[in-house]
Amino acid sequence: TGVIMPPKGYLKRLREICTKHGILLIFDEVITGFGRLGSAFAAQEFDVIPDLITCAKGLTNGAIPMGAVLVQNHIYDDMMAAGKGAIELFHGYTYSGHPVAAAAGLATLEIYRSENLLHRAADLAGYWEEAAHSLRGCKHVKDVRNYGLVAGIELESMPDAPGKRAYEVFVRC
């Protein structure tokens, strides 16, 4: 159902545990990145520095498929040192080298900056929360959760037909 936010302090404690045991902390910010929680990334919102951040969608405003993995310097340095004459972070090539997607990404990031969209998103959070939570008490709405501009609306399942009610709502909307 998604949009289940961690309790206060949870991610900071997780960072401590990962650091203590040499475990990489990875944040999947495909949904939460690019201002949806009020900061560029959820990591900033929760004041945690992960080792890797995955992001997509918001990178090009969803106009063209593009994803990225942001890594801390120590990971990049280790990857670069892995092979003689390494000239790049070996990341796979299925979706690399697409100038149109790169141009869309650069244009999107410039619009985020020039129109102050990350901060404007934070300003809209209260309105979005009120709108999403207005669905509480509606027929078949089991739960409503949100943080910033991200919301999850959980619908009751139909007996013996999981997903059917959500599909019917999708078709009507």
Regions found by a protein language model. Name each.
Residues 1-173:
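Conserved N-terminal phosphate-binding loop of PLP-dependent enzymes in the Aspartate aminotransferase
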